From Swiss-Prot:
This is V-type proton ATPase subunit d2. The keyword Repeat does not apply. It comes from Arabidopsis thaliana. The gene is VHA-d2. Belongs to the V-ATPase V0D/AC39 subunit family. PANTHER family: VACUOLAR ATP SYNTHASE SUBUNIT AC39. InterPro entries: ATPase_csu/dsu_sf, ATPase_V0-cplx_csu/dsu, ATPase_V0-cplx_dsu, V-type_ATPase_csu/dsu, V-type_ATPase_csu/dsu_dom_3. It holds the Pfam family vATP-synt_AC39. It is a peripheral membrane protein.
């Protein structure tokens, strides 16, 4: 703890911190996952989840179940928890909680714009959007032909508006430009969130700095790997990296010139916190990289609960619940497709 935060935190934040720690206690354990892995069909999964926090959300769902139904209902639990915390929060906690949903808003914008580019039905796309990232004018995203129109017609009245200053070009929207837009928006969002947490100070600043720096570094690695072999120049690649994190600035200089996965690995192994992640991979492969990053993120998120009187527990809980939903989606898909031998390939255990 820092200063006298502990003396005053509980006045406005104590109730919600108790609530979120209660939610954390309701996350699935390793024993739950072991039981889920034994399920023979989706109804078995529903039956096991009926004894968890997801029970009330799935109890009225008729058979036959689909994976999308399970994911949708479990996501509804996450959304309800978030809305309850947000309506109880006062400043600056309410602003902190709002920041948590901006990433989903960016993903929804990219989903709608990409789907429209490929002539998908707008209503179908909206149904696939994450509920935490919804905003009033989201359906009108389909009319935009370039970045300027996207901003002027739709996004100027959303919280994402300040992040668009680097994206305002008249270039037509194509797959490459949309992906650049996504990463530019995420860069601006992460830097803004990081600066906000620094202003809060104390344990919140310390823990969130670590969590957001890890997120920024992971995105830098993914941007590098995904842009290898594309027409994106080294300078353009470097512009997409966030201006903070363990890799900033020298790691970014090296990542910008990488031309294959082994060169990326060589850069990352110079940083002790990331050596363990890349040691799990054989040379030339990147399939296990996402899981290794998720495992490291979960470890850091769980550590956020070791301290009290800070806001990082809210961020950590939301991320852990999202990881849990990804786990349930993977398990459900494997069971539905009779691929139970692959269940452990992507499940990230928490407790």
């Amino acid at each position: 703890m820092y200063g006298f935060e502990a003396l005053t935190f509980n006045i406005h934040g104590g109730y919600l911190e108790a609530i979120v720690r209660g939610h954390r206690a309701g996350l699935l354990t390793t024993a739950d996952y072991n039981n889920l892995c034994q399920c023979e069909n989706l109804d078995d999964i529903k039956m096991h989840l009926s004894a968890t926090k997801y029970g009330p959300y799935l109890q009225n769902e008729p058979s036959p179940l689909h994976t999308t139904t399970i994911v949708e209902k479990c996501t509804l639990k996450l959304v309800d928890d978030y809305k309850h915390m947000l309506c109880q929060a006062t400043e600056p906690m309410s602003t902190f909680l709002e920041y948590i949903r901006y990433g989903h808003m960016i993903d929804n914008v990219v989903l709608i714009v990409t789907g429209t580019l490929h002539e998908r039905d707008v209503q179908e796309l909206i149904e696939k959007c994450h509920p935490l990232g919804m905003f009033d004018s989201i359906a009108t995203l389909a009319v935009a032909q370039n970045m300027r129109e996207l901003y002027r017609l739709v996004l100027v009245d959303t919280p994402l508006a300040p992040y668009f200053s680097e994206c305002l070009t008249s270039e037509d929207l194509d797959d490459m430009n949309i992906e650049i837009m996504r990463n530019t928006l995420y860069k601006a969002y992460l830097e803004d969130f990081y600066n906000f947490c620094q202003k809060l100070g104390g344990a919140t600043a310390e823990i969130m700095s670590d969590l957001l720096a890890f997120e920024a570094d992971r995105r830098a690695v993914n941007i590098t790997i995904n842009s290898i072999g594309t027409e994106l120049t080294r300078e353009d690649r470097k512009k997409l990296y966030s201006n903070f994190g363990l890799l900033y600035p020298y790691g970014h200089e090296e990542l910008a010139i990488c031309e294959d996965i082994d060169q990326v690995r060589g850069v990352m192994e110079k940083y002790p916190p990331y050596q363990a992640i890349f040691s799990k991979m054989s040379y030339g492969e990147s399939q296990m990289l996402d899981k290794a990053f998720y495992e490291e993120e979960v470890r850091r998120l769980c550590l956020a609960f070791e301290q009290q009187f800070h806001y990082a527990v809210f961020f950590a809980y939301m991320r852990l619940r999202e990881q849990e939903i990804r786990n349930l989606m993977w398990i459900s898909e494997c069971v539905a497709q009779n691929q139970k031998s692959r269940i452990h390939d992507s499940v990230v255990y928490m407790f």
